[in-house]
Curated annotation (Swiss-Prot):
InterPro entries: 6-PGluconate_DH-like_C_sf, 6PGD_dom2, G3P_DH_NAD-dep, G3P_DH_NAD-dep_C, G3P_DH_NAD-dep_N, NAD(P)-bd_dom_sf. The gene is gpsA. Its EC number is 1.1.1.94. GO terms for cellular component: cytosol. This is Glycerol-3-phosphate dehydrogenase [NAD(P)+].
Length: 338
């Protein structure tokens, strides 16, 4: 079946819209679909996403499509950019409408709610083994990507041909550099764990601990990510790249990050509900914390920072008490004996 569009993007929030803008700015005919018909009508009329990316006009190659069936019929390349807690339900909605030659890539960062399973497992459960799968991950703020500021990300998947073609489709010499990676598991993990650590970095700064503490937390957070990744069969090299260290540093140090701002509010004394309300958009790290904590327990992996953040978010522990517990942990070597 011939494509009438180069790619269809499912998810018209800030990040989905930003990726659609980037693709269309590169000359690719891009369809953008979202679940709210009224929102999609507004996007079509305004030719920008005023709610999430105000003032950034849509390129001519970006088209709004409110009908999911038409959106999925237009292209075999489907980019899913929705919150992790609705990832499975969106795939289930799309499944009967997918083309036989469809290929699925997602930029969703997170794990399955409650179970902590990787999104690849959710996708396979919903879609079966028929479709090639891939994931995008890396240090990207939606606004900067949409504005065309230089950005770099990584892509990995189940099919090398699909991965290579995604690199070509997404890459733009002026705005977006895309690195191929063969670590499908590592890219998925990095995007979830960094959200958790960013909340911790925000809490540390909100308490007033300063740059030394923030840097220590980021560094030990990277250790936790690597430890979990190794247990799941990921490559440690991945966590030194865009989807690991890159995304972790970005999200932990810049206030464009909702997760960091959420942590800041908690560190300054807000309760969880008030802090979430202040952000006004989905704080992926809130759910990610429970997901990562669940996965770590199931795998028997020690993640003390993640555990303390979990206790703050879900058990009412004070951020300062969590910090004190981390600081009072038993002394240990940074380079354990092999």
């Amino acid at each position: 079946m011939k494509n009438s569009a180069d790619i269809t993007v499912l998810g018209a929030g800030s990040y989905g819209t930003a990726l659609a803008i980037s693709l269309a700015s590169n000359g690719h005919k891009t369809l953008l679909w979202g679940h709210d018909p009224a929102h999609m009508q507004t996007l079509a009329q305004d030719k920008c996403n005023q709610a999430f990316l105000p003032g950034i006009a849509f390129p001519e190659c970006l088209h709004i499509e409110a009908d999911l069936a038409k959106a999925l019929a237009a292209s075999n390349n489907v980019l899913v950019v929705v919150p992790s807690h609705v990832f499975g339900s969106v795939l289930a909605q799309a499944k009967p409408l997918l083309r036989q030659d469809a290929r699925i890539v997602w930029a969703t960062k997170g794990l399955e709610p409650e179970t902590g399973r990787l999104l690849q497992d959710v996708a396979r459960d919903v879609l079966g083994e028929q479709y090639p799968l891939a994931v995008l991950s890396g240090p990207t703020f939606a606004k900067e990507l949409a504005m065309g500021l230089p950005t770099a990300i990584s892509v990995a998947g189940t099919c090398p041909k699909f991965t290579a073609e995604l690199v070509e489709l997404l890459h733009s010499p002026k705005r977006l550099r895309v690195y191929a990676n063969d670590d499908f598991i590592g890219l998925q993990l990095g995007g979830a764990v960094k959200n958790v650590i960013a909340i911790g970095a925000g809490m540390s700064d909100g308490i007033g601990f300063g740059a030394n503490a923030r840097t220590a937390l980021i560094t030990r957070g990277l250790v936790e990510l690597t430890r979990l990744g190794e247990a799941l069969g990921a490559s440690t090299a991945t966590f030194m790249g865009m989807a690991g260290l890159g995304d972790l540093v970005l999200t932990c140090t810049d206030n464009q990050s909702r997760n960091r701002r959420f942590g800041l509010a908690l560190g300054k004394g807000c309760d969880v509900d008030t802090a979430q309300a202040e952000i006004g958009q989905v704080v992926e790290g809130y759910r990610n914390t429970k997901e990562v904590f669940t996965l770590a327990k199931r795998m028997g992996v020690e993640m003390p920072i993640t555990e303390q953040i979990y206790q703050v978010l879900y058990q009412g522990k004070a951020p300062l008490d969590a910090a004190k517990e981390l600081l009072s942990r038993e002394k240990k070597s940074e380079t354990p004996a092999q």
